[in-house]
From Swiss-Prot:
Pathway info: Secondary metabolite biosynthesis; Alkaloid biosynthesis
Protein known as: Echinulin prenyltransferase 2
UniProt family annotation: Belongs to the tryptophan dimethylallyltransferase family.
Organism field: Aspergillus ruber (strain CBS 135680)
Coiled-coil parts of chain: none
Amino acid sequence: MQPYHTLSRVLPFPDANQKAWWDKLGPMLLKAMQSQGYDTEAQYAQLGMVYKCVLPYLGEFPTVENDATRWKSFLCPYGIPIEPSLNISQGILRYAFEPIGPDVGTEKDPQNMNIIQDCLKGLTQHDDRIDTTLHAEFSSRLLLTEEESRQFATTGQFNFGPGQGMHGFAVDLKGSRPMFKGYFCAGIKSVVTGIPTGKLMLDAVREVDTEGRITQPLDKLEEYSANGIGKLMLCFMSVDMVNPHDARIKMYGLQQEVSREGIVDLWTLGGRVNTPTNQEGLELLLELWDLLQIPAGPRSVAISHCSVGQPPEYMLPTLVNWTLLPGHSDPMPQVYLVPFGLPDSHISDCLVTFFERRGWTDLARDYKKNLASYFPDIDFTQSRHVQEAISFSFRKGKPYLSIYMSLF
């Protein structure tokens, strides 16, 4: 804990909210980095970036007392504006966050858009490797214009529930140098324009991809998304903030009818992808699905946030993303199994069993111990919210899993 304690003694905190966020995030992120073998330089560098570039944009620190009045982020069921995750296959910690502006929810900033450029400026000043070219292209197409923002604000109250927002960032903590990507949610733009979310994003990608480098996988995804089972809905996308020729574009969807058959449909694009690698990955994905025993059935997307301090009030849809890459005719799937609402002890047991079957001895031995160290105040025999989702992908003959975690 030395880097956290050292920085806590020397860094100034301009207000109580930022100090509270630091005391919540700092120990958790540090313990996660230490458990994954980050060296001391990387620990200081990454905590320093959180202090400088993230804490000022997290808004009110969530409490039971302010839960009804604070701005709720689209990122998490509890409306928390930052969501850590751990790529346990590669030992990489990451987090996504939605910058929260000082005037959020008022007439000055009804959709929480005013702070985006200020936060982005801070990130680019911190790391000059960030390339904002594609971020700017998609911002101009998927964020509201000033006129649309005014129009939207006068049409009535919009339910800014889980998954219903505008924009966020994700940070991969690779050693001492982070990697960044931007998220764009198309739901509000769809309401304003009357254009379905999927079409908004697909059209934006085609316009930006002027050389047609990802036309093949994009065409295949568009055809599938119009016919996928389980009430599939494309809802947001992400883009790497690197040189455009090296950037990955990912399209995200929600499958509202959760089932084993739906998982197969997402992974194979309704049978359109049937390569040996795809089938090998599918076998492992279904093994994980069978272990977790997530109840099948319909899930609503028209939901409100859960209340801080209270157990989950619902279960969530299956999430998926497809990576679109030049030179790949098929979109590359990553399916998120979402056991949010099931006992955390059950989820941990299932994951350990999966690790043991893969021969991941160290991971199977340490997973529960490490998870408990990240959240020392949580009773994992009672909690049902910490391990929100488990993402699964399969690349070059290997499964890759990430665990998405709720801080509250």
